[in-house]
Amino acid sequence: QGSNGCGKSTLLKLLNGLVYAEEGTYRFDGDVINEKSLKDNIFSKKFHQRVGFIFQNSDVQLFCSNVEEEISFGPRQMGLSEKEVKRRTDDVIELLGIGHLRERAPYHLSGGEKRKVAIACILSMNPEALVLDEPLAGLDRKTQEWLVGFLLDLKKAGKTLIVSTHNDELAHTLADRLVVIGDDHAIETITSN
């Protein structure tokens, strides 16, 4: 949690290997995460199967010609059988209630629909952890309420959620542990009740 510009998104990009630390190290499964390790196809595949990143701007992660192709892209890249790809795709489409969007082009969807598709894309790979950058940004109240409930359901199902937000209510609703980044980049950790 923190205000705009304090480094929340940069921290999440570091955690997901989209940018690299200039100093210090951090690890995944005992291995240092850096440009070299993520160029190793075996390590990169293992990492991205276990950690899913959902961008603040869903347009950044949507690129296929229709929603079904978009959601099936990740499982195909994992080398799963077409039968398993279809099962996972159908399962997350049903879970997120987006069957009516299956054949639609992602760039023609509303902001809330795009966010649901972006989440479906990541969930189709069944990662252990979801990293979400400002998940409520740009969503109407109804979609925000739905998304908070959905994230709580994922948390109850055992998913690890790492969420950046400047929304106090969301932070306190979702967090077991809250890391607050100040404007001066000072970090404070708070354990929620």
Describe the function of each predicted region.
Residues 16:
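Helix-to-loop junction immediately C-terminal to a conserved catalytic motif
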Residues 24-36, 47:
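Conserved ABC transporter NBD signature motif
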Residues 105-109, 113:
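Conserved ABC ATPase signature
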